[in-house]
Regions:
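Loop-to-helix entry region of an early transmembrane alpha helix in multi-pass inner-membrane enzymes
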Residues: 107-111, 115, 123-141, 304-313
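Short acidic/glycine- and proline-prone juxtamembrane loop motifs at membrane-interface regions
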Residues: 177-183, 358
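Specific aromatic-rich, kink-prone transmembrane helix
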Residues: 145, 165-168, 183-202, 221, ...
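Membrane-lumen/periplasm interface segments of specific transmembrane helices
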Residues: 42-60, 83, 210, 221-322, ...
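Transmembrane-helix motifs of polytopic, lipid-linked glycan transferases
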Residues: 119, 133-153, 318-325
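Signature aromatic-anchored transmembrane alpha helix within multi-pass, membrane-resident enzymes
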Residues: 245-249, 378-407
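Transmembrane-helix signature of polytopic, membrane-embedded enzymes
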Residues: 129-130, 146-168, 186, 332, ...
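Short hydrophobic/aromatic helix or loop-helix immediately within or flanking a transmembrane segment
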Residues: 82-125, 284-290
Length: 409
């Protein structure tokens, strides 16, 4: 359903001919394929070049004492530099030996992605290669489904640009790294697309997998519930469809149950947030704390942490108009999901750096990029270049920063 600035109260059923469906599918694959390879080539080239020219920060020995992200020797390690940094250490550790009861920090990292990495590792015999392959494949799927969903809601031109917008977003560096972002992106888009096209069993199953991938995954209940209430196909809403929605929290419940059966704390995923310095400050109070941190940072730009506060605030400012556009132009389910997902990091800020990880939270909020694609499609080539070129430059810079073991997000 094409939305031209007016928010409909209900969702219309999807009807298409087979020929039309085939054309749309082929366009989605072609556009996604191009965005995937160009963006990943940019990430790899920038990251490898930076690691080769400038080497690694001394932090590598502190945050990766076991050298799990650099097992190949100098040349090989440089080639995989953009793939395994920072949280990759945790995912690789979990893929190797799970969740020991004595290490509560690991419970902040949900199990589905490391489980897939461990499974792939039995074939490729390299945890880093396994993690990168899982992420790369998931990102490819995510781009195709994002194209399909955006075309459905906003039209083909918006879909074509939306996949480029998300692939070139600076936070997209993690979509091909040993991180769970690509898996969660694929599952969350697939979940919403399934519900949008009336496949409620698929929506519930993918939502449950999303809830086993990230702490925010359980919030996929929100868009599904709103979509169920907003159906307009002339039939009474089916209780069976709502029952599939109730499957979503099962992913989180399974994780908690597995921890308890292993002798650990069933509520460790919730308690782990305290270990990583997240605290409840009040609904969206993180916006104020992040603004204050950025203001202080402007007066102390010589400090890396201060500069990071300013950069993170810039991401927050850039996100606001996209959120407003989603609320105005997309069906209510998308806006509800975006607000619920942003409420987590912005209501539970990190003490030392309130907006920490915000670019990663934003990167997986696909409705934002759907609307960015629509806005760019409606404008001139100059508008598109003015947005996508700096975004690509930012992606290259972030790739260089992360690959040399300097912190981003």
């Amino acid at each position: 359903m094409r939305r031209d600035g007016i928010q409909a109260a209900v969702l219309q059923p999807v009807t298409r001919s087979r020929a039309r469906e085939r054309v749309i599918r082929e366009a989605a694959v072609a556009d996604a394929w191009a965005a995937l390879w160009v963006s990943r080539a940019l990430v790899w080239a920038a990251g490898v070049t930076a690691a080769a020219l400038w080497g690694l920060s001394a932090r590598v020995t502190l945050f990766d004492p076991g050298a799990v992200t650099r097992p190949f020797g100098p040349a090989g390690n440089a080639l995989v530099a953009p793939l395994a940094r920072w949280d990759s250490v945790w995912y690789l550790a979990i893929a190797n030996d799970g969740y020991p009861p004595g290490d509560a920090r690991r419970a902040a990292f949900f199990p589905l992605y490391p489980l897939l990495v461990r499974t792939a590792d039995t074939v490729v015999r390299s945890p880093i290669a396994a993690g990168a392959l899982v992420s790369f494949a998931c990102f490819a799927v995510a781009l195709v489904v994002l194209h399909r969903l955006t075309e459905l809601e906003l039209g083909a031109p918006a879909a074509r640009i939306a996949v480029w917008a998300i692939a070139l977003f600076p936070g997209a560096v993690f979509f091909s790294a040993v991180y769970s972002e690509a898996l969660y992106l694929a599952l969350s888009i697939g979940c919403v697309y399934s519900a949008r096209t009336g496949r409620w069993a698929w929506a519930g199953a993918l939502g449950a997998l999303g809830a086993a991938t990230r702490s925010a995954g359980v919030l996929l209940v929100v868009p599904l519930a709103v979509m169920w209430l907003a159906q307009a196909d002339g039939r009474p809403r089916r209780v069976r469809d709502a029952a599939w929605i109730a499957l979503v929290p099962a992913g989180l419940a399974a994780f908690c149950g597995a921890l308890a059966l292993g002798g650990g704390d069933a509520f460790a995923p919730m308690h782990a947030q305290d270990i990583w310095y997240r605290h409840f400050a009040g609904p969206f109070v993180g916006v104020w704390e992040g603004t204050a941190a950025a203001w202080r940072g402007l007066h102390d730009l010589g400090e890396p942490a201060a500069r990071a506060d300013v950069v993170l605030f810039g991401f927050l400012v850039a996100t606001v108009p996209m959120v407003i556009a989603v609320l105005r132009r997309l069906p209510a389910a998308y806006g509800a999901y975006v607000l619920a997902a942003l409420a987590l990091p912005l209501s539970y800020p990190v003490g030392p750096q309130p907006l920490m990880s915000l670019p990663r939270f934003v990167a997986v909020l696909f409705p934002l990029f759907m609307m960015l694609g629509a806005w760019l499609a409606e404008g001139s080539r100059l508008r598109r270049a003015a947005v996508l070129a700096p975004s690509a430059a930012g992606l290259a810079i972030v790739s260089a920063v992360v690959s040399t073991w300097h912190w981003f997000a």
